[in-house]
Amino acid sequence: MFFPKSSLRPGVAPREVFGWAAFDFANSGYTTVVLTAVYNAYFVNVVAGNASWATLLWTVIIAVSSAIGMVVMPVIGTLADAHAKKRSGLFIATVVCIAATFGLTLTGEGTIVWAALMIVLSNLAFNIGETLNSAFLPEIASDEGVGKVSGWGWSFGYCGGLVTLGLSLLLVTFGPELWGLDFDGSVAGTLWITGIVFAVATVPTFAWLKERAVPKPDAPRAAALFSDSMASLKKTASALPQLKHFGRLTLTGFLNQCGVSVVITLSAVYATAVMGFTLNDSILLVFLVNITAAVGAFGFGYVEDKIGHKKSLMLTLWIWVAMIVVAATSEGVVQFWIAANLAGIAMGSSQSAGRAMVAVLSPAARSAEFYGFWNMALWFANIVGPLTYGAVTWVSGNNHRLAIAITGLFFLAAIVVLKTLDMEEGRREALAFEKKVGWERAPVKPVRLP
């Protein structure tokens, strides 16, 4: 992968950026297999026995893991900033996510409690790892190239999802004939593949990605960490009046993620319930959508730096709206595949744009803290979005079309909020805030913003 020097900060080697992007490659298999293509539908239809409350229960489990993340992430964000422990925290989160993914191989019909525990642990660890890895972005990317580098990470991540899904598709297609695997065995096999790919692909991350932060002399210890992190979170929130455009971005990200989280966690459930998809169909669908997503994330990374992050994000939000309309009205497989590929284009590009915009609108010296705040908002969205979908299916007698249509309201609301965001003014707010509190970053070239 080629990384132009102009897109990187001084002293950052291309292989370090490759190591950073390798983590996106590694962990994408978890979301595609566990949350999107395989295990979510397996939980609803097998573990929970396709009960009327099964979809709602799945969304509750996802909500619980997100709620825990909202509580612990401020602690982890403060720890990462104060003790310069982003890299160590990233390693621990990786190990926990892989171990819990392997734990899911022990689930089956009726094992609701164990499955719920493993999902909560793995999803929590995944989100923590995603947050800590994102916090490295301002350290390795130049201000002019942050969109490109973020896009590289997302596109490389979708390539990782393709590798994991491709191997999983081969297993479920040929496994029954070659090794006599039944349905449960095929699902377990995809989980083993996911964990192994995750472990192997993170080797470049921990070999090459550097911790550039310096521990603060007055860094809090474990006993005082929670109270200090709560104070830090309060301080972050209290800074929002001075960083109003970061606040608007956070609200936009929350509304966008409400819809995105539904697509991630319930797409296979929707495809199975409404379109009659099999396990092979679902994996193939997500596999091809990941190709679209990789192209979208990579291409939009360059589009962002050409037309600006805000316009890029606005474009992807309208693509999400179009996807919802097509999916909710799909009567045939072709129409549904069109909706799925629209989701793929929007998925990587909207998340890449949001991550890049945080780097522009937040104080660089407190990057992990503000990324933690940003991700806390996204985790809250991971509660609200899926729970809304699950509640609608429950009260409407499993009307998944109605549930996906209501999901579209989140994207429309995000568009309304995004219209009020000004990137130039927001950038000035961030730099003025750094100067006011005495945390000025090293001199950089002027940033061209929309």
Residue ranges and their predicted role:
Residues 88-103, 311-326:
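Structural signature of the two symmetry-related core transmembrane helices
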Residues 32-55, 265-282:
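Short amphipathic helix-loop junctions that connect adjacent transmembrane helices
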Residues 151-172, 375-386:
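Glycine-rich segments within core transmembrane alpha-helices of 12-TM secondary carriers
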Residues 71-85, 295-309, 393:
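Helix-to-loop junctions at the C-terminal end of transmembrane segments
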Residues 2, 197-208, 405-443, 448-449:
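Multi-pass alpha-helical transporter architecture, strongest
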Residues 100, 111-129, 335-349:
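Hydrophobic core of transmembrane alpha-helices in multi-pass small-molecule transporters
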Residues 2-17, 210-251, 436-450:
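Juxtamembrane intracellular "pre-TM" segments in multi-pass secondary transporters
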Residues 51-53, 172-196, 391-411:
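A membrane-interface helix-boundary motif in multi-pass transporters
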